Amino acid sequence: MKRSMYAGRVREEHIGTTITLKGWVSRRRDLGGLIFIDLRDREGVMQLVINPEEVSSDVMATAERLRSEYVIEVEGFVEARQQANDKLATGMVELKVSALTILNTAKTTPFEIKDDVEVSDDTRLRYRYLDLRRPEMLENFKLRAKVTHSIRNYLDDLEFIDVETPMLTKSTPEGARDYLVPSRVSQGHFYALPQSPQITKQLLMNAGFDRYYQIVKCFRDEDLRGDRQPEFTQVDLETSFLSEQEIQDIVEGMIAKVMKETKEIDVTLPFPRMSYDVAMNSYGSDKPDTRFEMLLQDLTVTVNGIDFKVFSEAPAVKAIVVKGNADRYSRKDIDKLTEFAKQFGAKGLAWVKVTDGQLAGPVAKFLIAIETELSSQLKLAENDLVLFVADTLEVANNTLGALRNRIAKDLDMIDQSQFNFLWVVDWPMFEWSEEEGRYMSAHHPFTLPTPESAHELEGDLAKVRAIAYDIVLNGYELGGGSLRINQKEMQERMFKALGFTADEANDQFGFLLEAMDYGFPPHGGLAIGLDRFVMLLAGKGNIREVIAFPKNNKASDPMTQAPSLVSENQLEELSLQIESHD
């Protein structure tokens, strides 16, 4: 029989009609001779009633065989429920079954198919096809589909061209580790799965496409966390002849459309702008969460000269004030915060509390001479807790920024209903890598430096600024972009600044440099992490909740057992040998 509609869409207007439904048995109950079935499909749950006095003995026998997650087909008459269930969209109606067919049986599931089920993450991933049956998960993917639909419509209306770029590309340095794919035809050579379509989308601008977009899979072999996966999806944009502001206007319009169509929220445009330096110095992060205060305070000058060498001899002394919550933190709690601070390079964590109008705590005696000035600068009040970090400016900022976020979550200071977007601009072009012992690109080596700082490519790289911009949402980097280099001479200078010899630059990026000989237009773009965006819209804490078949924290798939061993024949075809490291 043909299905009449989704079970979750049956409403009062269907009362008096005969319909056919198909789906899964969510629950079966036997009450007073009647059998009640909760039938679940993609759109929700519908109650079925099987009355032995109104159906054949075959139907009754079939109904008695039903168990959870059996797949069934039913025909029946829609009636009003005697006792409505206002927790269900279908709660005003029920289906009196006249015909019933079992389409497939099911074993007992390893966990109950319902929201808020207590089960390990690996078990959820091992049986992901069951996990995805849960209504909460289905809603996540409906939201994701609405987001991508909204984005495509918006960009199509602005005459962006959707172009697919290669999945098998060339491995290049300056980024995360590549996933490599050995070539059977060119033995000893490898493709790389793209970390982004960065260079190919730039080449599309050289081809005259003017406006490109793609919702594209990307791959990075990096350590995983809650908002990262080895394969992820980004909304990738590139434009020709547009300014930084014009590109940002397009992106803001796209996000405003998504927010309106998926959350019914009118966001205020334009988004606030904050320089990288302000973000780091005031929030301790290049992706600041602006939903709460607790800004970092610079006390380096204030404490200069006091009789406490930890402060007076430190390159920087900064603090955050936890307003009105000192009594929430015992010595043991502060010790835990100290251990947390050490993860970010801090040697320790100094602290004082405001108790009975005076500073109290391990370092209070060293602050007596500046207590009035300190209290005024920090606007201290009774029951405030002050946390200090004395170290390099970088360590102080990073440590207090992390503490700020942790404490705000611990004290439930964040309004979870808010969506605070902002642009972080005026980025440094390079960042120092202790591991590499050299400067590396803060974004990528194709970013255009500001005209005022470009001369420092041959001087102090720390002074080079980039025409780059990140879009931030609630403390997460939603995406990043920049204007790109389109002049060959500037691109060669950039490669040289990064330590490439001319031969190395030509070997890795010769095709791009050659393209710059043929009228490369000014261009720029941006990429937004789609998984992360949907995660935040759905109010989830991990992007696994919005990716259909994600990997676990070991970059493995417990369901398919990927990655897996391959046969010796496959390795021989590729001229590969596996060395044991036992």
From Swiss-Prot:
**Recorded GO CC terms:** cytoplasm
Top-rank taxon of the source lineage equals Bacteria
Q: Where does ATP bind?
A: R220, D221, E222, Q229, E477, G529, L530, D531, R532
Q: Which residues form the signal peptide?
A: none
Q: What's its top-level EC category?
A: ligase
Q: Which GO terms describe its molecular function?
A: aspartate-tRNA ligase activity; ATP binding; catalytic activity, acting on a protein; nucleic acid binding; transferase activity
Keywords, A to Z? Aminoacyl-tRNA synthetase, ATP-binding, Cytoplasm, Ligase, Nucleotide-binding, Protein biosynthesis
InterPro entries, sorted = Aa-tRNA-synt_II (IPR004364), aa-tRNA-synth_II (IPR006195), aa-tRNA-synth_II/BPL/LPL (IPR045864), Asp-tRNA-ligase_1 (IPR004524), Asp-tRNA-ligase_1_N (IPR047089), Asp/Asn-tRNA-synth_IIb (IPR002312), AspRS_core (IPR047090), GAD-like_sf (IPR004115)
Binding annotation for L-aspartate: E174, R220, H443, R484
Catalytic function, reaction form: tRNA(Asp) + L-aspartate + ATP = L-aspartyl-tRNA(Asp) + AMP + diphosphate
Any single GO BP term: aspartyl-tRNA aminoacylation
Name the Gene3D superfamilies on file: Bira Bifunctional Protein, Domain 2, GAD-like domain, Nucleic acid-binding proteins
UniProt region (Aspartate), positions on chain: 198-201
Location (main, coarse): cytoplasm
Q: Where in the cell is it found?
A: Cytoplasm
Q: What is its EC number?
A: 6.1.1.12
Subunit structure of this entry? Homodimer.
Query: Which NCBIfam families does the protein's record reference?
Result: aspS_bact (TIGR00459), PRK00476.1 (NF001750)
Q: What does this protein do?
A: Catalyzes the attachment of L-aspartate to tRNA(Asp) in a two-step reaction: L-aspartate is first activated by ATP to form Asp-AMP and then transferred to the acceptor end of tRNA(Asp).
To which protein family does this belong?
Belongs to the class-II aminoacyl-tRNA synthetase family. Type 1 subfamily.
Question: Could you identify this protein by its name?
Answer: Aspartate--tRNA ligase
Q: Which organism is it from?
A: Streptococcus pyogenes serotype M28 (strain MGAS6180)
Q: What is the lineage of its organism?
A: Bacteria, Bacillati, Bacillota, Bacilli, Lactobacillales
Which gene underlies this protein? aspS
